[in-house]
Amino acid sequence: MKNKVNIDVPDAILEQLDDSVFESTNYGNPEIQRVGPKVRATTGESKVQSSIDDVLSNTLKDGMTISFHHHFREGDFVFNKVMRKIIDMGYQNLTLAPSSLTNVMNDIVIEAIKKGVVTNITSSGMRGTLGDAVSHGILKNPVIFRSHGARARAIESGEIKIDVAFLGVPNSDEMGNANGMNGDAAFGSLGYALIDAQYADKLVLITDTIMPYPNTPASIKQTQVDYVVKVDKVGDPDKIGSGATRFTKDPKELKIAKTVNDVIVNSKYFKNDFSFQTGSGGAALAVTRFLREAMMAQNIMASFALGGITKPTVDLLNEGLVNRVMDVQDFDKGAASSMKLSPNQQEIDASWYADPANKGAMVDKLDVAILSALEVDTNFNVNVMSGSDGVIRGAIGGHQDAATAKLTIISVPLVRGRIATIVPKVNTVITPGDSIDVVVTEVGIAINPKRTDLVEQLKQVPGLPIYSIEELQQKAEKIVGQPAPLKFTDRVVAVAEYRDGSVIDIIKEVAD
């Protein structure tokens, strides 16, 4: 069955997932019944355990669904520690449902798949050796990729039923009151883990620092926690987040960032109390810097900045240019350390951030979003998941969610090396073109023709080169030529869902 973005989804996949095809970015106002976790009452006994082995014996069975968060990023020690125990204890047929998978997790997940320990995965994304292995058919069942908002929705609705959540935290007291702001391995907001804490049947905290009771502020609360496991170390602070922010000096990135800024400040959305999400890449950080200068020059103050937060965004808060920072994750130490000092840097969970099936998410109030891409096609569809070789090497993250902003800008170079980024058709549609308003490259911009208001506004800007998306695609092709067609088998190795749970695309096994 074909969906709205002209992807033919096999009926067998729809039946296997009990799913429907993507039809619209408009979620509407359905009435939804949420699920609740099982709770075993306790009366104040310490929950601290010295061994993960006993906890696994008491909580985990074959066929269950387990979850982790990715806030430690490449500095994560918890995931591998727990998965090693699970493999060694011989568990089978588990569903792995983390908020995302980072490179440091790849080797042990591949081992778990080969040994039959993990037979299903749902995640925001994957990269490196794991992405390559899945793309070549290592996993028994298709991976399901969901955005951060869609994952929250799926957990709340029971589509993802977490039996046991293993959440690493830099601190906890003996009852399970914990936060991400204090300790050697502090990473700031626990945003993506909080939904697991709320809905998992069993919640296991793993920490290297036991604090006096009661430990506050408590992002995760003792009312949610079953066990606290003390370990030597939960993470490497130097790999959790970057240190001092380094602004890009790359001329191409700076040109893109300057053009993105020109689009924003010349749009109707650049006014007092506007809101924005900028991201964490080199060009995104440069946009934040240019935006700061424009806000100061025009005496404009933003109501809130949203999403993954960086030190430059926190600086805007401290300078009085942003009223609130709504923080679902922190990308650097500066952002992570400031949360405990500022009441205006608010920790939010993934549902509050981006869930379409609640009573109002932050993305619903977002004016401007600046997002990146691996590819954009002539229908403005965006791929952030698979590379030019067809191999999985990315993550949906909050891309689909933030793209619901009133002004969604994709910042992307025209080509990367010898690979075009503006193409006739993307390998994998992740964010539909209906969500995208402007594509910005170093040579110029393309405006979605459906946005006639933006066309009228931006064509008045002196020196702003405007092309059709087809013209940008042709410029890219002239530089790098046409690539050879990719070869795939008929086997589906992954399914990309839209934020409402419908199937927006499928990823097939790469043929060698």
Swiss-Prot record:
Coiled coil found in the keyword field: no
GO molecular-function term, one example from the UniProt record: citrate CoA-transferase activity
Enzyme Commission number(s) of this protein: 4.1.3.6, 2.8.3.10
Catalysed reactions listed for this entry: citrate = oxaloacetate + acetate; citrate + acetyl-CoA = (3S)-citryl-CoA + acetate
Organism: Leuconostoc mesenteroides subsp. cremoris
Sorted UniProt keywords: Cytoplasm, Lyase, Transferase
Cellular component per GO, a single term: cytoplasm
One BP annotation, GO: acetyl-CoA metabolic process
Gene this chain is encoded by: citF
Signal sequence annotation: none
The name this protein goes by in its record: Citrate lyase alpha chain
Location in or out of the cell: Cytoplasm
Taxonomy, superkingdom: Bacteria
Subunit structure: Oligomer with a subunit composition of (alpha,beta,gamma)6.
A matching Pfam family: CitF
Function: Represents a citrate:acetyl-ACP transferase.
